[in-house]
Amino acid sequence: ITPDDDLLAAFAGASGAAPAFEEQPEEEARVIAPFAWERLLMAIGAVGAMQRLIEVTVAYALERQAFGRPIGKFQAIRHHVAEMATKAEAARALTYNALRLFHEGQDCIQEVTMAKLVTQRAVLEIADQSLQIHGGYGYMREYGIERAVRDARLGPIGGGTDEVMKEILGKTMGL
C-alpha cells in the first residue's frame, strides 16, 4: 500500500505523526469523508428501528387491556406514543436531508453528523418509552423490546460517540 492508496498513511506522513487538522484542512476532509457513509447508514438504520418500535408499541397498546379498555386509549399512553412519533419524524427529516446532500455529492459532514447524533439519541429514547409502555412484558424476549433497547444503546457509541459528533459539529461551525 502506498501513501496514495492509504489515506491515513498519507495523512500521517513519513513521521507517522498526524499533523493538526488546522494545518491541513483538506486532509481532514479526506480522512473524515469516508465516515460520513458509515454514520449515514447508522442514521438510516435508526430511522427504521424507530418506525418498527412505534408500530410494535401501538399494536401492543391497542391489544393490552387495563380497567376494561386498551391501554392505548389512556391519555398518558397516547402522549408517550405522540412523543415517540414526533422524535422519529424529526430524525427522519434530518436523515433524509443528509442522504439527499450525500447523494448529490455535496459537502454534508455537518448534516450527516447531526443526523447521526439525533437519530441515535432518538432511537434510544423511543426504545426506552416503548419498554415503559410494555412494562414487564418489555423484558421478555418474545416481544423484542429488550433487544431493541440493547441495540439502541450501541448507537451513541458506535461510528463515533456523541461527544465526537459534537466536536465535529463545533468545528464545522467554526469553533
Identify the meaning behind each predicted range.
Residues 1:
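FAD-binding subdomain of flavoenzyme oxidoreductases
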Residues 4-27, 33-175:
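Alpha-helical interface subdomain recognition
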